[in-house]
């Protein structure tokens, strides 16, 4: 089965930055326990613009992790499946 991915974009103000970084750390810990890989990237030219990536080995694992997440994903039903390029 193909890997599954969801993406979320978040904008934070300079005053929210430290609190948001702590939130990202909590997300990383939670998703690691749920067997989901989590990454966060900040746009180089726009501080405070973040992309969060959630990847699991299958859509079911990803959906289950999102359903139990302490911080809900804005659109957990928008799931991308890996394209097999052979």
Kindly give the residue locations of the regions a language model identified.
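Short S/T/G/P-rich N-terminal loop/turn motif that feeds into the first structured element of a domain
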Residues: 1-86
């Amino acid at each position: 089965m193909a890997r599954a991915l969801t993406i979320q974009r978040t904008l934070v103000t300079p005053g929210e930055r430290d609190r948001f970084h702590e939130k990202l750390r909590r997300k990383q810990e939670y998703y690691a326990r749920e067997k989901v890989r989590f990454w966060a990237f900040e746009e180089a030219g726009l501080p405070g613009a973040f992309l969060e990536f959630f990847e699991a080995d299958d859509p079911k694992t990803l959906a289950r992790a999102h359903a139990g997440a302490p911080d809900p994903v804005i659109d957990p039903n928008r799931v991308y499946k890996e394209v097999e390029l052979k």
